[in-house]
UniProtKB/Swiss-Prot annotation:
Domain Lon proteolytic, chain residue ranges per copy: 592-773
Enzyme class: hydrolase
Membrane spanning stretches: none
Name of the protein this chain belongs to: Lon protease
Active site per database record: S679, K722
Protein encoded by which gene: lon
Function: ATP-dependent serine protease that mediates the selective degradation of mutant and abnormal proteins as well as certain short-lived regulatory proteins. Required for cellular homeostasis and for survival from DNA damage and developmental changes induced by stress. Degrades polypeptides processively to yield small peptide fragments that are 5 to 10 amino acids long. Binds to DNA in a double-stranded, site-specific manner.
HAMAP family: lon_bact
Species name: Rickettsia typhi (strain ATCC VR-144 / Wilmington)
Keywords: ATP-binding, Cytoplasm, Hydrolase, Nucleotide-binding, Protease, Serine protease, Stress response
Subcellular location: Cytoplasm
């Protein structure tokens, strides 16, 4: 070859020797550039390239000074392009060369000069050295299965030709297990004798290391096998011994508990009988597991364990007032209940049942009662329960059987006299698995619950010291169950009570949860009132607490997002900036007096509402139509009001001989909301009279009351909520049934001060105060 300059490629982890064929993966940019610049030799139509080892393995882009000058001239046999701009080449090392004038540009390029081997002077000695090296290599190959058999065959083939000593030395050198630096030194060595001597020394070292490692592995393997066998046998022996000891120890513990616990006579006899069976059983049998579980359950109940509670009604009252605002009647009845317990120290009174809409504090009241009595609190949620086994338990014969939740709660609180909440007692149902309401009869009957028998235990357990308190959203309970309980109705909070609860409880609670500093966020009273009126519609305060939480979060976000904002004041003017548009609206008084339109008062589970009732007359057949999603009772009230009006038409100076020629349509707005009840009778009657006499109704007058066909006004419920709605809506005068006057003592003073409350006993008194003028003896006839 005449050309003395070729592209140069640096290798990371390989030293090639002349005569060796090797594959190389090419991925670095300079190496790929060098590969692309190779040209076909004119002499033999072949591409050549220079390859050399770089001095530092981890160098990604070595400079020309970081390359060894002793390199290999290689012939490129094959180039295969791979994905990701890489390639695989197969090269044959042709000769050892000395590099000079290395150029470091886009790729390496260098001049080269072939380095010849020194002449072998003593061929006989060389033959002996090579034979020795080959024998060592064969021995090494037998110990190390990684050496390819083809390499051994190639070496044996070359040794038969006495002139190929150099090739044999190079092949042996390329397969030595040694450092890259040692291999590079072998490449640089020009003396064949010195090279073969180094190869023999390295092979000898490799064989010794391999034999030592192999012997060590054998010794370690035998030791591990022996250790594992000994460990397995030892652990098996320990497990067997432990099982035997544990069984004995566990049986001894069960026997000790039977003797030490204050079991009833019946329970002790049952426990001893079951224990005798267990001791005689095979401890690995399934039946022994059932018996063991039964005994563990029986002995884990708090037999004879009672909290030493001392009831102090003054302290209990303080706790109730601390945790709950308002609810005075409810608190008073609870204190009376506790007073009886304090004096008698025995529970024989009725079971309390707190009935009210969600969120009014029924569950938290029971917690406060437990704290006031100094007893533990247990809760049994009955919502959705339809299997009586939840109360009485499953019989032992069933797979996975367990005691009922009543005893389960006693086991949990570890006392036989807790305060137990029976939550959502109205939401039980029954199916083919039984009626849980009937199962509760025994639990709640003071004459029976001292002998309560759970199906799982099959022995009596005394529940007479448990204080049972139930809660419900509806008074619709099975009669037998209802008969065993004293119902306390919680009507819900009025606006003023919600305001005080928010100021004194909810806002401080949310500020504490969100780590609000003093004076960092202030929420005005009018903002809280707007929250109650326009963002919540409930009888309790759960939604109100959620809105206060949202308000606090948004205000805190503003403070943290803007360092210039140190505090935020929230009032009714900027409330919508935080919570968006108002969600609800309460009724407001009409802007002017209207004919055929009257303001009634309604009571819903979320409080009182103004109820507008309007009517029109048109040609027809003398019928009365009602719309607004009215219930049957309210429709009947409309019919009664119309009949009452027609019977009294002559008193108003009206002729009724043409009533069959027109229809009256009564509508109650908010048609999507169901409405029912008899208390709109007065308002319906007044609306019809106003329509037929064409006399307006005072816009600031609202009314409530059921009427009879004879015109008498009957009492209604929900007076407190209705009066609050009237006061809130701008009403000045409210007409109420005379029989409801006794309920005014429960109305907050501020509401009574804002309203003129007039009691009425008949519809004539209603018309006197409701209509702008009385329609008497006017000689009117109704014309369309």
């Amino acid at each position: 070859m005449n050309k003395k300059s070729l592209p140069l490629m640096a290798l990371r982890d390989m030293v090639l020797f002349p005569g060796v064929i090797a594959p190389i993966f090419v991925g670095r940019k300079k190496s790929l550039q060098a590969l692309s610049r190779t040209t076909i030799s004119e002499e033999n139509n072949t591409k050549y390239i220079l390859v050399t080892l770089q001095k530092k393995f981890d160098q990604e882009n070595p400079s020309k000074h970081e390359l060894y000058n002793t390199a290999i001239l290689a012939k490129i046999i094959q180039i295969v392009k791979l994905p990701n701009n890489t390639a695989k080449i197969l090269i044959e090392a042709v000769a050892r060369v000395k590099l000079s004038d290395i150029k470091d540009e886009e790729s390496f390029e260098a001049n080269y000069e072939i380095i010849p081997d020194e002449e072998i002077l003593d061929m006989h000695n060389m033959r002996s050295l090579v034979d020795n090296a080959v024998q060592l290599f064969n021995k090494y190959a037998m110990n190390d299965k990684k050496v390819n058999t083809e390499i051994i065959e190639t070496i044996n083939k070359e040794i038969s030709n006495k002139t190929n000593f150099i090739n044999i030395i190079n092949i042996l050198a390329s397969h030595l297990i040694t450092s890259l630096e040692t291999k590079q030194q072998l490449l640089e060595e020009t003396s064949p004798v010195k090279r073969i001597t180094t190869v023999i020394t390295t092979l000898t070292s490799n064989i010794v290391n391999s034999e030592t490692e192999h012997a060590l592995q054998q010794r370690v393997r035998k030791q591990i096998e022996k250790t594992q066998r000994d460990y397995y046998l030892h652990e098996q022996m320990k497990a067997i011994q432990k099982e035997l000891d544990e069984d004995k120890s566990e049986l001894a513990d069960i026997e000790k508990k039977i003797k030490s616990l204050k079991l009833s006579k019946e329970a002790k006899e049952k426990a001893e009988s079951e224990f005798k069976k267990l001791r005689a059983m095979n401890q690995m049998s399934a039946e022994s597991g059932v018996t063991r579980n039964y005994l563990e359950t029986l002995l884990s109940l708090p037999w004879g364990k009672y909290d030493n509670s001392k009831i102090d009604i003054n302290q209990a009252e303080k706790i109730l007032n601390r945790d709950h605002f308002g609810l005075e009647k409810v608190k008073e009845r609870i204190i009376e209940y506790l007073a009886v317990l304090q004096r008698s120290n025995k529970i024989r009174g009725p079971i309390l049942c707190l009935i009210g809409p969600p969120g009014v504090g029924k569950t938290s009241l029971v917690k406060s009662i437990a704290e006031g009595m100094g007893r533990k609190y247990a809760k049994f949620s009955l919502g959705g329960v339809r299997d009586e086994a939840e109360i009485r338990g499953h019989r032992k014969t069933y797979l996975g059987s367990m005691p009922g939740k009543i005893l389960g709660q006693l086991k949990k609180v570890k006392t036989s006299n807790p305060v137990m909440l029976l939550d959502e007692i109205d939401k039980m149902s029954s199916d083919f698995r039984g009626d849980p309401a009937s199962a509760l009869l025994e639990v709640l009957d003071p004459e029976q619950n001292s002998h309560f028998v759970d199906h799982y235990l099959e022995v009596e357990y005394d529940l007479s010291n448990v204080v049972f308190i139930a809660t419900a959203n509806s008074h619709d309970l099975p009669r037998a169950l209802s008969d065993r309980m004293e119902k306390i109705y919680i009507s819900g909070y009025v606006e003023e009570e919600k305001l005080q609860i928010a100021k004194n409880y909810l806002v401080p609670k949310q500020f504490k949860v969100h780590k609000i500093k003093k004076d960092e966020i202030t929420i005005s009273e009018d903002a809280i009132l707007d929250l109650i009126r326009y963002y919540t519609k409930e009888s309790g305060v759960r939604a109100l607490e959620r809105e206060i939480c949202a308000l606090t979060r948004k205000a805190l976000k503003q403070i943290l997002a803007d360092n210039t904002v140190k505090n935020i004041s929230i009032d009714s003017n900027n409330l919508e900036e935080f919570l968006g548009a108002k969600k609800y609206n309460f009724g407001l008084v009409e802007k002017e007096d209207q004919i055929g339109s009257t303001t009634g008062l309604a009571y819903t589970e979320v409080g009182g509402e103004l109820l507008t009732i309007e009517a029109l007359a048109f040609s027809g057949k003398g019928e009365i139509k009602t719309t607004g999603k009215l219930g049957d009772v309210m429709k009947e009230s409309a019919m009664a009001a119309y009949s009452c009006f027609r019977s009294r038409a002559p008193n108003f100076g009206l002729k009724y001989d043409n009533y069959k020629d027109f229809d009256i349509h009564i509508h109650v707005p908010a048609g999507a909301i169901p409405k029912d009840g008899p208390s709109a009778g007065c308002a319906l009657f007044t609306t019809i009279v106003s329509l037929m006499t064409k006399i307006p109704v005072h816009r600031t007058v609202a009314m409530t009351g059921e009427i009879t066909l004879r015109g008498n006004v009957l009492p209604i419920g929900g007076l407190k909520e209705k009066l609050l709605a009237a006061s809130r809506g701008g009403i000045k005068t409210v007409l109420i049934p005379e029989e409801n006057v006794k309920d005014l003592k429960d109305i907050p003073p501020n509401i009574k001060e804002n309203l003129e409350i007039i009691s009425v006993s008949n519809i004539d008194q209603v018309l006197k105060h409701a209509l702008v003028e009385m329609p008497i003896n006017k000689g009117l006839s109704y014309d369309l």
